[in-house]
Amino acid sequence: MKPRRSMLFIPGANAAMLSTSFVYGADAVMFDLEDAVSLREKDTARLLVYQALQHPLYQDIETVVRINPLNTPFGLADLEAVVRAGVDMVRLPKTDSKEDIHELEAHVERIERECGREVGSTKLMAAIESALGVVNAVEIARASPRLAAIALAAFDYVMDMGTSRGDGTELFYARCAVLHAARVAGIAAYDVVWSDINNEEGFLAEANLAKNLGFNGKSLVNPRQIELLHQVYAPTRKEVDHALEVIAAAEEAETRGLGVVSLNGKMIDGPIIDHARKVVALSASGIRD
């Protein structure tokens, strides 16, 4: 499976970006019908995204749509449009509880049945944006087999906490809570956006923090951030060589019917082998010096 490190937000009302965003090289494009779209443009943006999702050039890249919350006048209409158009994943903003996911899942399944899509083919992502969402992160992450990822969204979260964006200290607990919930549920976790697009040094510092904590990637707001993020997540040649040795040792042990895998006198267990396979998968997109 192709790694999903970068998810690039594309404003749903920006027809020019909708028609070209597949060329930027992000692992996934995330059409935004929520915060990036004004109230008067909601209907137009929904139609533009509906049309973009059906374009042949988007068939080779993962598509995600951030809909409006279901308790707004726009959320259900967004969902009807994007599921019928064949979106790969729906991102639900402001997810506070497992019930939010259950409601979303019920609507998605109904729409799939009505339009003839394979039931279960539309994946879900929960965006956690409040103290309540952080507290309920584990139950949210386990709420549905459709849920492929959870993401932390910083702006609403820090507002809810009565603080503001700073050096990252204000997000540390939430990051750890979301990560632990994702790992317990066996799904991916995505870090917050870095909105200061001209501060490359700051972006790289936060991207390295996200990687070192264990996030699978980040949501992005500018195409210039894609290659920077991919370089952060790219393994080194030494890491790739070691991973290949681990995989070879595991395959040899399996061929010989051995129950124990060892490499250079050290025992190798399942998690190490799984990690090696992930390193090799990442290396297909580039290797750092």
UniProtKB/Swiss-Prot annotation:
GO terms for biological process: acetyl-CoA metabolic process; oxaloacetate metabolic process. The keyword Metal-binding applies. Substrate binds at residues 66, 129. Pfam families: HpcH_HpaI (PF03328). It is found in: Cytoplasm. Mg(2+) binds at residues 129, 156. It catalyses: citrate = oxaloacetate + acetate; (3S)-citryl-CoA = oxaloacetate + acetyl-CoA. It is an enzyme of class 4 (lyase). The keyword Lipid metabolism does not apply. Binds 1 Mg(2+) ion per subunit. InterPro entries: Aldolase/citrate-lyase_domain, Citrate_lyase_beta/mcl1/mcl2, Citrate_lyase_beta_bac, Pyrv/PenolPyrv_kinase-like_dom, Pyrv_kinase-like_dom_sf. Oligomer with a subunit composition of (alpha,beta,gamma)6. Belongs to the HpcH/HpaI aldolase family. Citrate lyase beta subunit subfamily. Represents a citryl-ACP lyase. This is Citrate lyase subunit beta.
